[in-house]
Amino acid sequence: CLPHCPTYRVTGDERRSPRGRIALMRAVERDGAAPDQDWYDAFDTCVGCLGCETACPSAVPYGYLINATRSAITSERRPPFKLLVGLRLLSWPRLLRWGSKAIAVVQRLGLLRRTGLLPDRIPFRSQRAKNPGSRNLRSGEPAEVVLFTGCVMDVWQPSVHAAVIDVLNAAGIAVERSGDAAGCCGALHEHAGLTDDAVSHALRVTAALSDGRPVLVDSAGCGAALKHYGRLLGSKAANEFSSRVYDIHEWCVDDSRVSSLVASVEGRTGRPIVVVQDPCHLRHDQKCHDSVRDLLRPIADLIELDDEGLCCGAGGAYQLLQPDLAQAARDRKVASVHRAIRSESSVTLA
């Protein structure tokens, strides 16, 4: 697992590896060792990419172990204040929108970098899709599927949701947005060890989307969280809900109407060159990253990165809490992208 761990690749420190972290878990749980700051740092620096799970021949459930450990840590030690504030915002969609607008003004004035509180590259200034409500349903038809819009994605990257709805509508599929009724999926709360908060979000989502329709997700982290509600909530209803959650690529590949749409545009504008970068939670958690390739291959020439799916370092809130490690992982990923496109004059990164 060591070559697949971004923090071990950066630090070379065994304590910053999956194997080392599991050893530290055992030292406290089985041997009664007292946690010190180095012990806490080992878990704080884990990005949670789960690349180690994919590489592990023994199928050690590292994701479950790290979440359980962080939950135990949180019961003894509160997470950083700025993380708690950020996670609280995710529970209030309107407040998140207004807060993002305020931060966007600070960003536009060039003041955000001076504060050192948030990375300047976060797209606070992204505009919402025009008239997103008009895209909810096609011509008054009952929606066949629900698009999970979440919290941050809906505020900072609404164009992704709009593009998904455009594609599905073009294929003749009516779509309904989950909107604020469902809200946040709770993934970041669970990763932070705030299990009770994660459960509250999961209960809200499952209650809002309980009518049996497929739930499509265009964010890998959200999709992974929704697919794990059965484990998190431990109920029959939660397992039923998770069984009808699909990553958007996964669902589109299996839908004949989308396949027909793809076939209709094949060759119309030539074959673009696309470099594929897998989100960790699509590749290592949901394990449905091949569906991206299956969807694109008929209409594009694909280039694979040479890093075997190594994490980009973003990790949700990780880039805010561990900026140096996140930047080092990002630099490695950017170098891999540059190697992939060095001989191409025009490419798209997907």
Model regions: which residues?
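Iron-sulfur cluster-binding electron-transfer modules in prokaryotic oxidoreductases
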Residues: 62-350
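Non-heme iron-sulfur electron-transfer modules
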Residues: 7-41, 59-85
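Cysteine-centered iron-sulfur cluster-binding motifs in ferredoxin-type domains/subunits
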Residues: 1-9, 36, 40-60, 309
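Short His/Asp/Glu-rich catalytic/ion-coordination signatures at enzyme active sites or charged loops
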Residues: 30, 55, 193
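Short intrinsically disordered, low-complexity coil segments enriched in acidic
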Residues: 1-5, 11-12, 19, 166, ...
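Generic structural signal for well-ordered, non-membrane alpha-helices
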Residues: 3, 23, 41, 104, ...
